[in-house]
Amino acid sequence: DIIDYWPDKKLINRNTGELANNFWAPQIVRVGDKLIIDEEDYSNLGEKVLERYPEFTGANIAVGGHTDGSMNLPKPGLVICCPWMGPEDFKDTLPGWDVVRIENPKYMATGYGDMESWIKEKHVTNGRWWHPEAKSSPDMVKFVEDWLSTWVGYAEESVFEVNMLSVNPETILSLNYQPEVHNALKEHGIEPIYCRFRHRNFWDGGLHCLTLDTVREGGIQDYFK
């Protein structure tokens, strides 16, 4: 099974670090003919995945969460990542690629008021969604929880924006303007287009998450020659 909701992470056997039947979908990123595999929770995830998909090669990395909320590959040769990662994390995984580290990923123009309040209130909704009135309105919480009874999102991914959708090497889509990310993209010849998605907290955070099932045309390329 593939899981994508924080409380379900307990399904991982942390005692052995071995892959059983569950793993997080964002633990695998495809870069042409190469799979970047997050093995922080599963020491043998890469082995199992490559057994199933022998047409790919693999490289391991330790992120321990949603990879697309920690790093983004806007175009071949470029990585944009959050401060808990850095060039040393990619020297073997993406050799020779430029690594731009974003130091303040949570300081962006949300336009939705004070997003910091959700950090204090997320225990009310278990982090699945955010609203400034959730803490004081149990009836509203019950209504939304019932409505989202089969949904598995996590609102935390909405407060930073390396979680973007690359359209082509010169164009990328993002939900919000973030100065560091914006400037890094422009410096590398990439035009960011901002697409406001009002209800993104209901559909699992950033634009890359929202479009994870996008199918791209074209063949499998080698970006490491």
State what each model feature region is.
Residues 1-225:
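The feature marks the mature, well-folded catalytic cores of soluble enzymes
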